[in-house]
């Protein structure tokens, strides 16, 4: 298995500098990761630098709380795509999900999917650490109904990250035709292999180089 092609090489810390982001971009070129996952402010830089390379440009929408308005998320998506993003990882409205407002949650996702249609993959971050199992299932079902390409466990900025149990539940819920992304706390090759075995088709990590080289000592967190 080519683990590198399953990894979104990630740098989302608020204090990331241009030098930090360039390092991630160069590593993505060298190791041929699936994508770089960066904050929207770095999308144009990444798109320019990765032109001609088989590495997607992934950014985050409504991140990390998911509490911006649907209109804002849709605008962020269009703006990111205009600057060169080919994948967007959006955060659901977690509070609305917990309120049982399925209509709002679905519309929130749907509007981002429509804004990205034909131009970028949409991954929906459900923030599993804040949800009950019933809420996780409902979030996945609403994501599929709204037309999302992937469901994703975590932002990496809340109280917990991906677990193999959550990945298995998400995979069971969405079926074989929607992607499942594990992110948050995936720092070693063993972690990544566990997630893939549980059903993940993509892994978000900042310790991507250490994962590929199977070097636990090199693992760091840029979430």
Curated annotation (Swiss-Prot):
Give GO terms for biological process.
2-deoxyribose 1-phosphate catabolic process; carbohydrate catabolic process; deoxyribonucleotide catabolic process
Pathway per its UniProt entry is: Carbohydrate degradation; 2-deoxy-D-ribose 1-phosphate degradation; D-glyceraldehyde 3-phosphate and acetaldehyde from 2-deoxy-alpha-D-ribose 1-phosphate: step 2/2
UniProt cross-references to Pfam families, sorted A to Z: DeoC (PF01791)
Which keywords does this chain's UniProt record carry?
Cytoplasm, Lyase, Schiff base
User: Which SMART domains does the UniProt record give?
Assistant: DeoC
Enzyme class name: lyase
Highest rank taxon of the organism: Bacteria
Q: Where is the active site?
A: 89 (proton donor/acceptor), 152 (schiff-base intermediate with acetaldehyde), 181 (proton donor/acceptor)
Role of this protein:
Catalyzes a reversible aldol reaction between acetaldehyde and D-glyceraldehyde 3-phosphate to generate 2-deoxy-D-ribose 5-phosphate.
UniProt source species: Bacillus cereus (strain B4264)
According to its UniProt record, the EC number is: 4.1.2.4
Q: Which family does it belong to?
A: Belongs to the DeoC/FbaB aldolase family. DeoC type 1 subfamily.
Cellular compartment(s): Cytoplasm
What cellular component terms from Gene Ontology apply here? cytoplasm
| Annotated gene | deoC
Concerning InterPro entries, the annotation shows:
Aldolase_TIM, DeoC, DeoC/FbaB/LacD_aldolase, DeoC_typeI
Instruction: Give the protein name, as stated in the record.
Output: Deoxyribose-phosphate aldolase
Q: Which reaction does it catalyse?
A: 2-deoxy-D-ribose 5-phosphate = D-glyceraldehyde 3-phosphate + acetaldehyde
Single Gene Ontology MF annotation: deoxyribose-phosphate aldolase activity
């Amino acid at each position: 298995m080519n683990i590198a092609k399953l990894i979104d090489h990630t740098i989302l810390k608020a204090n990331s500098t241009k030098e930090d982001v360039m390092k991630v971009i160069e590593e993505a070129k060298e190791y041929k990761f699936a994508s770089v996952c960066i904050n929207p402010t770095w999308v144009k830089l990444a798109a320019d630098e990765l032109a001609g390379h088989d590495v997607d440009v992934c950014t985050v929408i409504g991140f990390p709380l998911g509490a911006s308005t649907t209109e804002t998320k849709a605008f962020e998506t269009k703006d990111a795509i205009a600057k060169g993003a080919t994948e967007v990882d959006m955060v659901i409205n977690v509070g609305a999900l917990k309120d049982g407002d399925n209509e709002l949650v679905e519309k929130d996702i749907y509007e981002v999917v429509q804004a990205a249609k034909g131009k970028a993959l949409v991954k929906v971050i459900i923030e599993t650490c804040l949800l009950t199992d019933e809420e996780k299932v409902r979030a996945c079902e609403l994501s599929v109904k709204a037309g999302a390409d992937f469901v994703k466990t975590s932002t990496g900025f809340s109280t917990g990250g991906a677990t193999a149990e959550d990945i298995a539940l998400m995979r069971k819920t969405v079926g074989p035709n929607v992607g499942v992304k594990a992110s948050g706390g995936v720092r070693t090759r063993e972690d990544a292999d566990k997630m893939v075995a549980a059903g993940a088709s993509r892994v978000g990590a900042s310790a991507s180089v250490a994962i590929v080289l199977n070097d636990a000592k090199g693992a760091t967190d840029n979430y």
